[in-house]
Design a protein with these regions (language model features):
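PLD/PLD-like phosphodiesterase catalytic module centered on the HKD motif
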Residues: 1-130
Length: 130
């Protein structure tokens, strides 16, 4: 089961980052359905086109944000909430279809990643709330 499927099955929040608009467009239909089935989502990407994701296709419980020109832009992150706190995948896009990263169920590590994203983006991603 992938992280997104876990979020849907367990009705828990989801954080997903995409390096480029093209990578989001590849999964856009799938994500449009996922966002309707979870309590909250943060979708962050190197989005340059403000009309990439039509507002009427996104539930009010979802936040779509651009991380263009930040240190998050080259990151592929997918996080959800498990019984012991957040868990997920954190990877850096090295180019040429190569990534460097890790999957962890250690909530302290994921919470540190979320803190960096919150500080960089000046937002509040909080998996304690549903």
């Amino acid at each position: 089961m992938d992280i997104e499927a876990y979020a849907v099955k367990n009705y828990v929040p989801l954080l997903a980052t995409f390096e480029t608009e093209a990578l989001y467009k590849y999964v856009q239909k799938r994500y449009t359905e996922i966002l309707k089935k979870i309590p909250h989502a943060w979708v962050i990407g190197g989005f340059d086109d403000p009309f990439l994701i039509p507002p009427d296709s996104v539930p009010a419980t979802s936040e779509i944000l651009s991380c263009l020109d930040t240190n998050i832009e080259k990151m592929w992150i997918v996080v959800t909430k498990g019984p012991n706190g957040p868990f997920g995948l954190v990877a850096e896009d090295l180019g040429n279809d190569k990534f460097r990263g890790f999957f962890t169920i250690d909530s302290k590590i994921i919470e540190k990643v979320i803190k960096i994203i919150n500080n960089t983006m000046r937002i509040e991603i909080n998996f304690s709330k549903e």
